[in-house]
């Protein structure tokens, strides 16, 4: 549908001012947006992608569930992202059986149920919400202290957007990715099925992020084309492991 915007605009009697906004875009994506909308010499504003209050963690645990249980604290608003509805329900069920005030959220639930789960999380009636990426679009809960990815996302853009739901109040918050070889195998299989070359390139960037020994914050900022990137942020898994 985005690709049809220029056709629509061209049919108007007078071309209006066209403005485009996005939360996360690499230099290549920004160039593509300008081409798709046929923007001629646009005024471009790119703000910093750096969120100094966020700690970025990367872990490859032997047992993801055991590690997840260690990370979750009582009365600490936490979002756990999983890649599939089945995984969401499975993980949430295990948390509930451990006495954790948690509920799940995905697009397979009715609008009424989704609305109820959102309200329970926003008003602190539950501590943890386990969700697919269907959660969070338009949801702004400022005091989320942890965003934990139980599975590796398919691309860095998705990861950054989802992790960015932590610490919107400006207070310290943690973004932790738990990944394993199984995540890589499943994601590669799914992308290959769709014969998506661009998707595979993005997935490989995500895998590189998981395996890099450089500063995680610097890796992401570099990916989004930000300049003046610190070599050592002192606030991610890799930088702290150097100490």
Predicted regions and their residues:
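Helicase motor core with emphasis on the C-terminal RecA-like subdomain
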Residues: 1-201, 226-230, 237-238
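Cys/His-rich short segments
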Residues: 202, 207-243
């Amino acid at each position: 549908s985005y690709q049809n915007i220029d056709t629509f605009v061209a049919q108007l009697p007078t071309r209006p001012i066209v403005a485009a906004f996005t939360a996360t875009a690499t230099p290549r994506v920004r160039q593509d947006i300008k081409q798709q909308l046929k923007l001629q010499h646009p005024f471009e504003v790119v703000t910093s992608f750096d969120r100094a209050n966020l700690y970025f963690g990367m872990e490859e645990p032997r047992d993801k569930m055991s590690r997840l249980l260690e990370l979750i604290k009582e009365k600490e608003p936490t979002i756990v992202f999983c890649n599939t509805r089945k995984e969401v329900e499975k993980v949430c069920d295990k948390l509930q059986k451990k006495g954790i005030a948690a509920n799940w959220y995905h697009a397979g639930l009715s609008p009424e149920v989704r609305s109820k789960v959102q309200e329970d999380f926003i008003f602190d009636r539950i501590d943890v919400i386990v969700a697919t990426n269907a959660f969070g679009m338009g949801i702004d809960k400022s005091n989320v202290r942890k965003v934990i990815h139980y599975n590796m996302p398919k691309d860095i853009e998705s990861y950054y957007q989802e992790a960015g739901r932590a610490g919107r109040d400006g207070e310290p918050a943690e973004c932790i990715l738990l990944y394993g070889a199984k995540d890589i195998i499943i994601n590669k299989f799914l992308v290959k099925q769709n014969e998506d070359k661009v998707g595979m390139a993005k997935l490989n960037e995500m895998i590189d992020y998981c395996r890099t020994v450089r500063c995680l914050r610097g890796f992401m900022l570099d990916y989004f084309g930000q300049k003046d990137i610190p070599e050592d942020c002192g606030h991610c898994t890799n930088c702290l492991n150097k100490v």
